[in-house]
């Protein structure tokens, strides 16, 4: 059951990343996270 939850979270995270990637602020957010 725990594995399925992790898979679901991974899918959601991938969707969020794709949405952020289309926005101009994505590069700014990535730079902030890398620092």
Curated annotation (Swiss-Prot):
Keywords for this protein: Amidation, Secreted, Toxin
Which GO molecular function entries does the Swiss-Prot or TrEMBL record give? Answer: toxin activity
Could you say which protein family the record assigns here?
Belongs to the cationic peptide 04 (cupiennin) family. 02 subfamily.
Q: Does the keyword Membrane apply?
A: no
Location relative to the cell: Secreted
Q: In which tissues is it expressed?
A: Expressed by the venom gland.
Q: Which domain of life is it from?
A: Eukaryota
Q: What is its main location?
A: secreted
Know the name of this protein? Cupiennin-2b
GO cellular component terms, semicolon-separated:
extracellular region
Residues with the Glutamine amide modification: 35
């Amino acid at each position: 059951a725990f594995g399925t939850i992790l898979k679901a979270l991974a899918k959601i995270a991938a969707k969020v990343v794709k949405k952020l990637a289309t926005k101009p602020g994505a590069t700014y957010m990535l730079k902030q996270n890398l620092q």
